[in-house]
C-alpha cells in the first residue's frame, strides 16, 4: 500500500 500513500502525498504536494 506504499504506492497508494505516495500517490496521496504527491496529490497534496
Swiss-Prot record:
| Any one annotated GO CC term | extracellular region
Query: Which GO biological process annotations does it have?
Result: defense response to bacterium
Give the Leucine amide positions (modified residues): 13
Source domain of life: Eukaryota
User: What does this protein's UniProt record list under function?
Assistant: Antimicrobial peptide. Active against the Gram-positive bacteria S.aureus FDA209P (MIC=44.3 ug/ml) and B.subtilis ATCC 6633 (MIC>64 ug/ml), but not active against the Gram-negative bacterium E.coli or the fungus C.albicans.
Similarity comment text for this entry = Belongs to the frog skin active peptide (FSAP) family. Temporin subfamily.
Q: What is this protein called?
A: Temporin-GH
According to its UniProt entry, this protein's organism is: Sylvirana guentheri
Amino acid at each position: 500500500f506504499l504506492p497508494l500513500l505516495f500517490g496521496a502525498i504527491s496529490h497534496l504536494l
